[in-house]
Amino acid sequence: GLGDVYKRQTMDMRQYRRLKMFAHAAALTDNVTDPEDGQLSVFIRLGSDYRSNFYEYEIPLKLTPAGHYNGDSESDQLIVWPKDNMLDIALSVFTDLKKKRNQAKNNPLSGVSYGKLYSEYDSEQPANKISIIGNPSLAEVKTMMIGVRNNSRSKKSIEVWVNELRLSDFDEDGGWAAQGNMNVQLSDLGSVSMAGHVETAGFGGLEQSVSERRLDDYYQYQFTTTFELGRFFPKAVKLSAPIYYSYSREKTSPKYNPLDKDMLLKDALDALANDRERDSLRNIANEITTYKNFSLSNMRVGVTSKNPMPYDPGNFTMSYSRTKRHNQGLSLIHISEP
């Protein structure tokens, strides 16, 4: 038997560490089905849908005996809301289970696949069970389900209350940022300027919420130079050739694997078999953009004949420019389960 309630809401849970919820269960007043502790359980599902891609955590319910209880008494509160019924878990139990499932899936004799429910008991709370099916992600939780499951072989009737489902314990691993600039004037030959900017994962402004902090490392630097090529020729040539060149590079290295967004990229790299596979994932994960610009503006030779003519070199100018942009990174993902 199964009873449940649903909520649709897109949420990124990666910036939190724990998931909590109170649960209360009691037999109905007439108690005709005679339920006992552990015969029913409460569970919560988090995923992109309710059936094919979700994490699940299940807790066997301890029943509160019939009676009158004092809401101001801590001992009575623990009877009504038993610790055994409380959901208080690290969100990492889900991603740890995903790692184990994915490792088991690599063994063709295991029978494990994305399409089959994979379950283990919680090592810290051995009565509770953790499950996964498909490829859910805590980065994109679109559906939440809270349900009650009858684990006995007969009909059972109970009253269940759940309260204060919440995320807690922000990930307080902060980041840092820095930037620098340098300009050099080379007399009348030209100038050189350089700039750099770094922001690491976890960095955010004072006005930003936890969910708005960076989830990647960002590196950017730029080199720019302008100089007058004519200064390197004899004055008699009267050459004017202003040259401009710039080079910039931006690199974004995500904290999480872009192919599996609630798994740390470093863990995904460690799980790969060889350097070739690791380099391939890095090339996909890291987004790198480079710009190269070169221009020669209004180059002219200021030489004219004694009797000015239309075809004098000083009457002509030439300009040339070229811009090159190169992008590297993830552009398309398609994952299929055979």
Which role does the model predict for each range below?
Residues A25-G38:
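Extended, low-complexity, turn-rich repeat/linker tracts enriched in Gly/Pro/Ser/Thr and Asp/Glu
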Residues Y57-P65:
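Solvent-exposed serine/threonine-rich low-complexity stretches and specific carbohydrate-binding patches
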